[in-house]
UniProtKB/Swiss-Prot annotation:
<dbReference type="InterPro" id="IPR048641">
    <property type="entry name" value="RlmN_N"/>
</dbReference>
<dbReference type="GO" id="GO:0070040">
    <property type="term" value="F:rRNA (adenine(2503)-C2-)-methyltransferase activity"/>
</dbReference>
<feature type="binding site">
    <location>
        <begin position="226"/>
        <end position="228"/>
    </location>
    <ligand>
        <name>S-adenosyl-L-methionine</name>
    </ligand>
</feature>
<keyword id="KW-0489">Methyltransferase</keyword>
<feature type="active site" description="Proton acceptor">
    <location>
        <position position="102"/>
    </location>
</feature>
<protein>
    <recommendedName>
        <fullName>Probable dual-specificity RNA methyltransferase RlmN</fullName>
        <ecNumber>2.1.1.192</ecNumber>
    </recommendedName>
</protein>
<dbReference type="GO" id="GO:0002935">
    <property type="term" value="F:tRNA (adenine(37)-C2)-methyltransferase activity"/>
</dbReference>
<keyword id="KW-0479">Metal-binding</keyword>
<dbReference type="GO" id="GO:0051539">
    <property type="term" value="F:4 iron, 4 sulfur cluster binding"/>
</dbReference>
<dbReference type="GO" id="GO:0019843">
    <property type="term" value="F:rRNA binding"/>
</dbReference>
<feature type="domain" description="Radical SAM core">
    <location>
        <begin position="110"/>
        <end position="339"/>
    </location>
</feature>
<feature type="binding site">
    <location>
        <position position="302"/>
    </location>
    <ligand>
        <name>S-adenosyl-L-methionine</name>
    </ligand>
</feature>
<feature type="binding site">
    <location>
        <position position="124"/>
    </location>
    <ligand>
        <name>[4Fe-4S] cluster</name>
    </ligand>
</feature>
<dbReference type="InterPro" id="IPR004383">
    <property type="entry name" value="rRNA_lsu_MTrfase_RlmN/Cfr"/>
</dbReference>
<feature type="active site" description="S-methylcysteine intermediate">
    <location>
        <position position="344"/>
    </location>
</feature>
<dbReference type="GO" id="GO:0070475">
    <property type="term" value="P:rRNA base methylation"/>
</dbReference>
<dbReference type="GO" id="GO:0005737">
    <property type="term" value="C:cytoplasm"/>
</dbReference>
Length: 351
């Protein structure tokens, strides 16, 4: 049994959500049970969506009582549920320790695409000037079961299954790499939630050592970089991560990703008038886009309460026109859920 699991045995019940099948097998054997019980539990949690031991009807009463005493099927508590006029729904969850974080259900206009935006941390270690989460006190990383359970609880409440999951909620995913990748593997596993790897997107603000690890491990998931400015000095003014990981280093890692994994990367770009827009910034962004296989998602600023304003539709259209010489796909990403503080950059447990 791993040191992590041993520690949990000593401090209380072992949470079984967020475990790989191999880890569940180790736990069952350590408890004196046959390893095949692990697959039954795994299937029960993620396919049947069981939430209590009583639902495991193939288990004997003795086994259920034993597991009830030693293992936990803990689930997140929903402390707030808000619905937008556009169909977006925001969920504020509380962990067992009472720490709050958020996830968002985002259906497309035609209902064909249903995305859950999930959090990886409570608050964030970074200070992106346009992001409401950055203003919160950082309270720690989420464990894998707390990440996976966001998807399970949202799907249960809305009564529908997501077509896509994006790690773009609270926190920097690559500052919680192990738990994020473990959660993604459960979301992807055909014996669990069975989401295709291309339907799972992990985003980073530019943690280069995390990108290197992602490449080395040949992770199959979609990958996005929150770029937001094409110039190192300009980027430093709005993203403090530039102090640790320079833009040049980040772009080299992005090029290595596309070359070694032969997959396209997505650049997320928040449009802030007078800060990240205009012909000069557009030309620099075009140069970056031409240097590797990428697409660009442009996002009009949502957090106007930080002293900047949201670009007009005309300004957005003009900026996109300036980017067209890059010859890459450009998406003007809609940001639903503004009325419930559920849009991109707005997650901060506000209502």
């Amino acid at each position: 049994m791993t040191q992590e699991i041993l520690g949990e045995v000593q401090t209380g019940k072992i949470p079984l959500k967020g475990r790989t099948l191999k880890e569940l097998s180790e736990i069952m054997v350590s408890l004196g049970e046959k390893s095949f019980r692990a697959k039954q539990i795994y299937h029960g949690l993620y396919v049947n969506r069981y939430e209590s031991w009583e639902q495991f009807t193939t288990f004997s009463k003795t086994l259920k009582e034993k597991l009830e005493g030693l293992c936990s099927l803990t689930q997140l508590t929903v402390v707030k549920h808000l619905k937008s006029v556009d169909g977006t729904q925001k969920f504020t969850f509380a962990s067992e320790q009472g720490k709050e974080f958020e996830a968002v259900w985002i259906p497309s206009g035609d209902g064909g695409r249903k995305t859950i935006c999930i959090s990886s941390q409570v608050g964030c270690t970074l200070n992106c000037k346009f992001c409401a989460t950055a203003k919160l006190e950082f309270q720690g990383n989420l464990k894998a079961h707390e990440i996976v359970d966001q998807v399970l609880q949202v799907e249960k409440i809305v009564g529908d299954n997501a077509t896509n999951v994006v790690f773009m909620g609270m926190g920097e995913p690559f500052h919680n790499y192990f738990n994020v990748i473990r959660a993604a593997s459960i979301l992807h596993d055909p014996d669990a939630l069975n989401l295709g790897a291309k339907r799972i997107t992990i985003s980073t603000s530019g943690v280069v050592n995390g990108i290197r690890r992602f490449i080395e491990n040949k992770e199959p998931y979609n990958f996005a970089i929150s770029l937001n400015h094409p110039d190192p000095n300009g980027r430093l003014q709005i993203m403090d991560i530039e102090e640790k990981f320079a833009l040049s280093e980040l772009l080299q890692a992005a090029k290595d990703f596309t070359r070694e994994l032969k997959r396209r990367i997505t650049f997320e770009y928040v449009m802030i008038p007078g800060v990240s827009m205009g012909p000069e910034n557009a030309n620099k962004l075009v140069k970056i886009a031409r240097s590797l296989d990428c697409k660009i998602n442009v996002i009009p600023l949502n957090t106007e309460f930080f002293g900047w304003r949201r670009p007009t539709k005309q300004e957005v259209a003009e900026f996109i026109t300036l980017l067209e010489p890059a010859g890459v796909p450009i998406l003007n990403r809609r940001s639903p859920g503004k009325d419930i503080f559920g849009a991109c950059g707005m997650l901060a447990s506000k209502s």
